[in-house]
Amino acid sequence: MKIKICGLSTKEAVDTAVESGVTHLGFILSPSKRQVAPEKILQITNDVPKTVKKVGVFVDEPIDFVKKAIQVAQLDLVQLHGNEDMNYINQLDISVIKAIRPDQEFKEYEDVILLFDSPQAGSGQAFDWDSLVTSGLKNKFFIAGGLNPENVAAAIQHFPNAYGVDVSSGVETDGIKNLTKIKNFVQNASLASSKQLFIEFLRITKKLNENKIIPYLMGSLAVEQIINFPTNPDDIDIQLKTSDFENFEQLTSLMEKLGYQLIDLHEHKFEKASIHVGFASVETLKNYAGVDYLTIQQERMENGEKYHLPNVEQSLKIYEAAKRDEWRGGKQKDSFIFDELIKEQKRNDNE
């Protein structure tokens, strides 16, 4: 789940958002009480990891102004809140998020990330969620408008296929970003997203169990189950015994029955709406992290579904290896999770 905090204007708020685990930082570059200059954006984000995306928000600005701001602020995406059409968007050599009202026509915006917002963006007013039907929607989309730490979990539950959630005034007090609200919003969004992913993992596990396969849950979703700490997992990381990969066509057929499409044969990755599932061989853990899969003996049963889960010590070895892995992205997140695992290990040692 992507989590975006918008309307940022201070280094303190940016740092808090990044440390809390956001994926996107939003900055208003058009006239607004939250407006910030491109030069200041560059200044307050100079040490933000590349894995956290900087989004510039514009409303019907001249295209040259937007292009200049992208260059100066070193933006990763732009978010358009005006009447910009595809002719306008096609002039931008950058990923675009297009904000629209739930009752607005959006068929022309192919291959554009959508952001469903209230008619008055940044007002703190929510729109009627029931008025928006997203089943069958091919575009990735954010939900915005009136979100806050108290209702973001309900929003994620209501829109399980959402690409992300976006908040601005919902993490403010008297028009100023509230650092505690930012932390609470990110934590609540992360926990709600993880719950949705875990439910989906159990659906997949049920199918695997029916074929006499017991999967190994790995990655940040596994860590959240182990130490009960929000990690905002991006996907479902499943490992299987090599023998279970021998009939990959059967595995592909199984995933297709659950609504997934194979998007990367080499990496064994599947996709359904905003959910990504990756499969790998659990035997590779020994060379990668010094973890013999035969020692992963923690077996869990959830609603009758059976799966394996690494313990804290094994997870520490895996994330220590991930931190050294030059091919992996998300280094900051790996380090963050590693630090939390260290804390959990110390707590266990003191008990």
Curated annotation (Swiss-Prot):
Q: Which UniProt keywords apply?
A: Amino-acid biosynthesis, Aromatic amino acid biosynthesis, Isomerase, Tryptophan biosynthesis
Using the UniProt annotation, give all residue ranges assigned to the region (N-(5'-phosphoribosyl)anthranilate isomerase). Answer: 1-198
The lineage's top-level taxon is Bacteria
Signal peptide positions on this chain: none
Question: Which Enzyme Commission number(s) are on file for it?
Answer: 5.3.1.24
> One Pfam annotation, family name?
PRAI
Copy the pathway line from the protein's UniProt record: Amino-acid biosynthesis; L-tryptophan biosynthesis; L-tryptophan from chorismate: step 3/5
- InterPro entries, from UniProt? Aldolase_TIM, PRAI_dom, RibuloseP-bd_barrel, TrpF_fam
Residue ranges spanning the membrane: these are none
Recorded catalytic reaction(s): these are: N-(5-phospho-beta-D-ribosyl)anthranilate = 1-(2-carboxyphenylamino)-1-deoxy-D-ribulose 5-phosphate
- Enumerate the GO terms in the molecular function aspect: phosphoribosylanthranilate isomerase activity
Q: Name one GO biological process term.
A: L-tryptophan biosynthetic process
Show the SUPFAM superfamilies listed in the entry: Ribulose-phoshate binding barrel (SSF51366)
Into which family does the record put it? In the N-terminal section; belongs to the TrpF family.
Q: Which PANTHER family match?
A: N-(5'-PHOSPHORIBOSYL)ANTHRANILATE ISOMERASE (PTHR42894:SF1)
In its UniProt entry, what is this protein called?
A: N-(5'-phosphoribosyl)anthranilate isomerase
Source organism per entry reads Lactococcus lactis subsp. lactis (strain IL1403)
Organism taxonomic ancestry? Bacteria, Bacillati, Bacillota, Bacilli, Lactobacillales
